[in-house]
Amino acid sequence: MDLLNNLLIGFQSAVTLTNLLYCFVGVSLGTLVGVLPGMGPVATVAMLLPITYALDPSSALIMLAGIYYGAQYGGSTTAILVNIPGEAAAVVTCLDGHKLAKLGRAGAALGVAAFGSFIAGCFATVLIAAFAEPLTLVAFEFGPREYFSLMVLGLVGAVVLASGSLLKAIGMIFISILLGCVGMDVNSGALRYVFGVDELMDGLDFVALSMGVYGFAEIIRNLDAAGSREAVPAAVGKVLPSAKDLKESAGAISRGTILGSLLGILPGGGALLSSFASYTLEKKLAGKNARPPFGEGNIRGVAGPESANNAGAQTSFIPMLTLGIPSNAVMALMIGALMLHDIAPGPQVMTTNPSLFWGLIVSMWIGNVFLVILNIPLIGLWVKLLRVPYRLLYPAILVFCTIGVYSINNNPFDIWITIGFGIFGWIVNKLGCECAPLILGFILGPMLEENMRRALLLSRGDLTTFVTGPISGSLLAVSAVLLLLAILPSVRSGREKAFVED
């Protein structure tokens, strides 16, 4: 009965004209940035953070969430039609999706992707609703040492599951923790890393950093790598998949949904890891006798990954909503949005702001319905948007970013910080470093330090307090095992292969 009462609270919050509008705006923007190669949900959410300051917290979170899971839908469109993933998680969809388009079956591929995404999204939302309250009750048992260990696990997970070099991911985490130390120490009042700059006394602004690393850097990166795009196929064909397509895809959709739902909860997991894991699983299950072979237009190569990335995108909200721990860069930005509204992330959100908590969960069901409507009947509109020249798109984004950053504190210094981090983000990207650990570390670093200090204060400086507690010790043990496994040569080579196209 408690779950039904909570869902009723959620429906009362989500099914209002204002929140329905923001849900629709969010999923529409998400589909748009998913369709347009070079954009993505992280950059878009970062750019829209300043706008959310003027919105009701529920409306803001509903819109930002819609952008994230909406982008997973839209990313498949460009992957199938032009062989360019609009969103990173859609990389593997290119392998079979575009082959199907070349065979004149683009409509079937798009239809299966949309239906698989809808089923996975609805299932994942049910999981969030079912497990949110039990996990939140467990989180209330957490003290400073448990939170410290949980944040260590979050940072280790971000390192282990980040694409590319393990050492580079660790380096990005250390840099982000140092950046989180900038400003006045709240305990001692000492100034750290301000270098005589008064504007840095309050620390680096999260919006400026995230918008620089993802907004400005993304523009520089795409202009630097500007190239020609393949022509969009002239005819998409019938969008609704046939009964045969649905029958062939049913198993892949089911497996992708379950796999994505589980992997989405992991720190650093989410949609990207889920889609790669699903494609690998389907390929292994089919074996060498698959007809057609994977990579040559097998519908399961579209159904599995698209279901997995949507399920993973939505279950990644579980640790953010229940524990206040972001599992990926978008969730870190969502926590930033909560902080903008003076809402402390963590298990107390469900008790102090139940309409926000349950309204967000219910809005995901509504958003999935909106996305089916947007992605099947309006496919022709998204195809036309693929022809928008980048030289017109990026100046508008640049102006929007600048206005957004300035509007938070009305401080020109924030614009310089954004430009600086834009250049920094572009440089580290050129060096093969992923920026997601930087955002996660910047959010978790200060929380890690604060909980470590509290735990040591309560234990009178006894460092063994972190390993003597059953929950804290277990979390640290899991972190150590994950790190050791990632260092092993066989695991490391498998990890690197997971993020490379076959």
Sequence positions of predicted segments:
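Helix-loop-helix hairpins and the membrane-proximal interhelical loops
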Residues: 1-58, 139, 191-298, 383, ...
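Transmembrane alpha-helix interface/packing and boundary motifs in multi-pass membrane proteins
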Residues: 27-41, 71-83, 158-163, 258-267, ...
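Short helix-coil transition sites and intra-membrane helix breaks within transmembrane domains
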Residues: 33-42, 80-91, 123-127, 263-273, ...
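Re-entrant/interfacial helical elements at transmembrane boundaries that shape
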Residues: 41-51, 64, 79-99, 130, ...
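Membrane-interface alpha-helices at helix entry/exit sites of multi-pass transporters
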Residues: 58-62, 99-116, 288-300, 332, ...
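A structural-propensity feature for long, helix-poor, extended segments
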Residues: 68-80, 86, 297-323, 327, ...
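Membrane-embedded alpha-helical segments of transport systems
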Residues: 69-74, 115-127, 179, 300-317, ...
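Membrane-embedded alpha-helical modules
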Residues: 111-227, 340-494
